[in-house]
């Protein structure tokens, strides 16, 4: 079982903690989420600690990431989205660092677990819903009835739109977890074949593995971007009601 491609996703208790009858143990998932947060904070601290007129490469890379998120909000929401930059930026960076940290050998990918991605998705869902009610009050409920819908079709449209709205955190979380898990399983399986093929083909399979790892890094970045841009689109729906 130790060689199973799925063994890399096993959650292991490091510190057993019971609190008020609940199991809140510190696991390998917990430590990698904490490590991702520390690495992200360290990266931006070093990038902006001693800002210069002629920025360093580290500062430039950090500014590119920040501008990416700021542009994402501006394009999807407009000026009204600026106040959400800290939240959306933190979300993007956390997912990005968790995804990339999972690419290091013998590490653990926290975003491959639905409990982690669903928690992030439900936080986005609650934030979007609260923003909608705070900004529009009961008028927010018009989101579930598209403008111009015939009266006889209204009950059906409300049910469909409500179901679609409630399904958002599920689809958002499943997309991220499934893509990260599938990619790592594929990498593990092909890596096993590569070791066997090297007996006969020498070093020929190595470039294939390098290309595959490069593709997985691209997917890790892309999935963080998709999760974030969908969050921006959901925010736009409740801020700019149509």
UniProtKB/Swiss-Prot annotation:
Show the SUPFAM superfamilies listed in the entry.
F1F0 ATP synthase subunit A (SSF81336)
Q: Where in the cell is it found?
A: Cell membrane
Provide GO CC annotations from the record: plasma membrane; proton-transporting ATP synthase complex
InterPro entries in UniProt: ATP_synth_F0_asu (IPR000568), ATP_synth_F0_asu_AS (IPR023011), ATP_synth_F0_asu_bact/mt (IPR045083), F0_ATP_A_sf (IPR035908)
Q: How does it sit in the membrane?
A: Multi-pass membrane protein
UniProt entry tagged with the keyword Transmembrane helix = yes
Keywords (alphabetical) are: ATP synthesis, Cell membrane, CF(0), Hydrogen ion transport, Ion transport, Membrane, Transmembrane, Transmembrane helix, Transport
Residues annotated as transmembrane: 29-49, 84-104, 114-134, 140-160, 181-201, 203-223
Q: What Pfam families does the database record attribute to this sequence?
A: ATP-synt_A
Q: Which domain of life is it from?
A: Bacteria
Q: Name one GO molecular function term.
A: proton-transporting ATP synthase activity, rotational mechanism
Return the NCBIfam families for the record.
ATP_synt_6_or_A, PRK05815.2-4
Report quaternary structure and partners.
F-type ATPases have 2 components, CF(1) - the catalytic core - and CF(0) - the membrane proton channel. CF(1) has five subunits: alpha(3), beta(3), gamma(1), delta(1), epsilon(1). CF(0) has three main subunits: a(1), b(2) and c(9-12). The alpha and beta chains form an alternating ring which encloses part of the gamma chain. CF(1) is attached to CF(0) by a central stalk formed by the gamma and epsilon chains, while a peripheral stalk is formed by the delta and b chains.
- Protein name as catalogued: ATP synthase subunit a
What organism does the record attribute this protein to?
Rickettsia africae (strain ESF-5)
């Amino acid at each position: 079982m130790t060689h199973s491609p799925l063994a890399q996703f096993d959650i292991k208790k490091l510190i057993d903690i019971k609190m008020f009858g609940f199991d809140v143990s510190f696991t390998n998932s917990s430590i990698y989420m904490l490590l991702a947060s520390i690495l992200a904070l360290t990266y931006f601290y070093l990038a902006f600690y001693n800002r210069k007129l002629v920025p360093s490469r580290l500062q430039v890379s950090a500014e590119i990431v920040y501008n990416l998120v700021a542009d994402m909000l501006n394009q999807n929401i407009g000026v009204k989205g600026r106040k959400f930059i800290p939240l959306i930026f933190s979300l993007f960076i956390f997912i990005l660092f968790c995804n990339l940290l999972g690419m290091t050998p013998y590490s653990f990918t926290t975003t491959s677990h639905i409990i982690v991605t669903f928690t992030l998705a439900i936080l986005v869902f609650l934030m979007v819903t609260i923003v909608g009610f705070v900004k529009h009050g009961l008028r927010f409920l018009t989101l579930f009835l598209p403008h111009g819908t015939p009266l006889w079709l209204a009950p059906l449209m409300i049910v469909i739109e409500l179901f679609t709205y409630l399904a958002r955190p599920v689809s958002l979380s499943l997309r991220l977890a499934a893509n990260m898990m599938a990619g790592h399983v594929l990498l593990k399986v092909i890596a096993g074949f590569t070791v066997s093929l090297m007996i006969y083909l020498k070093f020929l399979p190595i470039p294939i593995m390098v290309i595959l790892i490069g593709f997985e890094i691209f997917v890790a970045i892309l999935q963080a971007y998709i999760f974030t841009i969908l969050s921006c689109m959901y925010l736009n729906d409740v801020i700019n009601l149509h």
